[in-house]
Each structure stands twice: as structure tokens, then as C-alpha cells.
């Protein structure tokens, strides 16, 4: 099930909550101490003002200005199941690496964007796709919320019939805002025809290995593994190795000439247009997984680029199947009427 894939994140969130609770107790003690120091200085200032103090008001003022309250701990978050865009903006301020929005049934999320008063939600998620945009929200009740790094991933499932009803309006140019094309890891698997009962003990070693990889990625300092930091750049970045760059150039040339210039369904072409960034993104993810599993750092490897290219080929067949639900909708309607 979908939830099985999220168990490592759930484990990380439990550990983050335990750490947050421990830091919260220390914060409360530190806050009491800071308040006591502040009260003591206030008392001393009153005495200085009345001429009975041992120190000058200026020295006490300097100490008050230098007095710092302890930083309130922030709980690390990795995912959410339901949040308004205002609350999501606040969570992203506290978790600038981004968040995963998980819904078992995505149709509920999509439908919520059509409700009166929630019209801006859809635009918010469209803007969050790049992963490096900033966002400013101004509300009378909440005031101004500035989110430096707008980065949200969406994960969930949807039934083909409900997906079709959502895709049909997107065929209209005015309603095709590119949201569906941004769901780049769309998969539409075959139904299992020859079902068999499989009753096996899970591979605990593999499960623990997967968790360790995800935990290392969550806390990884990428600059220690070959990422470059430059002035003016908000994020460190990695290059392809020479071999991987050659493969990417060949793959991109094939995409531009063989796939994007053919007479194909327009929404499919728009979807494939997003692959220009999908392939290197998948290569980077694959490379970092290898690094977290013990491989050496450095440029994104040829092996990671090959995996990414193969994954894009795999996803292409699923994309065609998804859009095939509505590609010939006019002919299907005519056949039904006939």
C-alpha cells in the first residue's frame, strides 16, 4: 500500500517529536532563567533611578539590551496530510527543505481546490513545483507570511474513473494550467490477473537498510559529498560526471527531436516537456541514495544517469496510458451515442 512506502518518514517524525519534546523542556527552564535575569535587572534599574543603586543606569541598560531569550525549539516535519496553504507556508518556514503532502485519495485534495474561498490553493501548489520559489501571503487575520523556499511534493492515489473526470476539463486550453503535467511520477499499473497468496516474512535487513539511507539523507550535509556552494546561489549543487553529462546530452537530444516534435496528443507533449528537469532530478536522487548507502561522493555518476533515463522510459508508457483515458474522448462519446 501507499502507506508502507511512508513508514521510514513516520519513524523519522517520531524521533523528531521525541527530540522536540526534550528540547521543549529545556527551553522552558532556560526561559524562566532569562525572565529571572530580566526581572533582576529591572529591579536594579529602579534602584539606580532612585539613586540607591550600586551601578549606573547606562550599564544596566546595556545588559538588558544584551540579554537574549532562548530560541524556541522547532519540530522537524517531513510530511502532512491536510493543511491550509497559510499553515503550510508556516511549516515550510520551519522546514525549508520542503514537505510531503500525502493523501490516500488525491481526488479529495483536488476537489478542495475548487471550493469557494480556496481558489488560490491551486496556484500555491503550482508555484511549489519548482522547489526553489519564494512566496508571500498577506491576510488580514494572519498578517504577512513570507516563505523563503516553497517546496512541496504531492503523493497519493486516485481511481481511473475519478482521474478521467478531472482530466476532461483539462483538455480545454483555458483550464489546462499544467497541474497534471507536474505530477511527473504518474503510474497506472495493470490489474493483477493471476492473483496468488504470498505469505512471507518481510526482509528486515533490507527494511532497516532503507531506513538508514533515508535517515542519512534527511541529515546530510551535501557540501561534504561534493556539492558546490557559491555566492548568490541559495542552494549547493552537484554536476554530472563527464560520462553522465554525455549520456544526458544524448538523452536530451532524443527527447527534443524524437518525442517533442512528433504529432502527438498535446497534453502528452506538455508532460514530456517536464522531463527536461525530471531526468536530472531522478539522477541526482539516485546518486544521493548511493552516497547515503556508502558510495563515494562527487559528481552525479553515469550509473545514476542511466537509472534515471531508464526510469523515464518506464514512466512514458504509464503517461500514455493515463492520458489515453481522455485522448479519444470525443470518439468514445460518439461510439456510445451510436
What are these regions (language model features)?
Residues 1-338:
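Phosphate-handling catalytic cores of nucleic-acid transaction enzymes
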Amino acid at each position: 500500500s501507499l502507506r508502507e512506502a511512508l513508514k521510514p518518514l513516520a519513524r523519522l517524525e517520531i524521533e523528531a517529536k521525541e527530540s522536540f519534546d526534550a528540547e521543549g523542556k529545556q527551553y522552558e527552564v532556560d526561559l524562566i532563567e532569562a525572565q529571572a535575569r530580566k526581572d533582576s535587572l529591572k529591579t536594579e534599574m529602579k534602584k539606580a533611578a532612585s539613586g540607591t543603586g550600586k551601578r549606573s543606569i547606562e550599564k544596566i541598560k546595556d545588559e538588558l539590551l544584551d540579554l537574549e531569550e532562548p530560541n524556541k525549539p522547532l519540530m522537524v516535519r517531513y510530511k502532512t496530510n491536510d493543511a491550509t496553504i497559510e499553515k503550510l507556508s508556516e511549516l515550510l518556514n520551519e522546514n525549508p527543505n520542503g514537505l510531503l503532502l500525502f493523501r490516500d485519495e488525491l481526488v479529495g485534495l483536488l476537489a478542495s481546490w475548487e471550493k469557494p474561498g480556496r481558489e488560490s490553493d491551486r496556484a500555491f501548489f503550482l508555484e511549489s513545483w519548482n522547489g526553489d520559489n519564494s512566496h508571500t501571503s498577506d491576510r488580514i487575520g494572519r498578517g504577512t507570511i513570507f516563505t523563503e523556499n516553497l517546496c512541496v511534493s504531492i503523493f497519493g492515489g486516485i481511481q481511473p474513473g475519478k482521474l478521467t473526470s478531472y482530466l476532461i476539463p483539462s483538455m480545454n486550453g483555458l483550464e489546462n494550467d499544467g497541474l497534471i503535467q507536474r505530477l511527473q511520477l504518474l503510474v497506472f499499473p495493470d490489474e493483477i490477473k493471476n492473483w496468488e497468496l504470498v505469505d512471507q516474512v518481510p526482509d528486515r535487513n533490507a527494511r532497516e537498510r532503507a531506513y538508514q539511507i533515508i535517515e542519512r539523507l534527511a541529515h546530510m550535509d551535501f557540501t561534504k559529498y561534493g556539492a558546490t556552494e557559491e555566492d548568490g546561489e541559495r542552494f549547493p549543487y552537484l554536476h554530472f560526471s563527464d560520462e553522465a553529462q554525455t549520456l544526458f546530452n544524448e538523452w536530451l537530444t532524443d527527447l527534443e527531436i524524437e518525442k517533442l516534435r512528433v504529432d502527438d496528443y498535446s497534453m502528452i507533449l506538455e508532460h514530456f516537456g517536464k522531463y527536461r528537469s525530471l531526468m536530472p532530478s531522478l539522477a541526482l536522487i539516485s546518486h544521493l541514495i548511493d552516497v547515503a548507502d556508502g558510495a563515494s561522493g562527487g559528481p552525479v555518476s553515469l550509473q545514476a544517469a542511466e537509472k534515471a533515463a531508464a526510469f523515464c522510459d518506464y514512466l512514458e508508457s504509464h503517461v500514455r496510458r493515463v492520458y489515453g483515458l481522455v485522448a479519444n474522448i470525443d470518439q468514445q462519446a460518439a461510439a456510445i451515442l451510436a
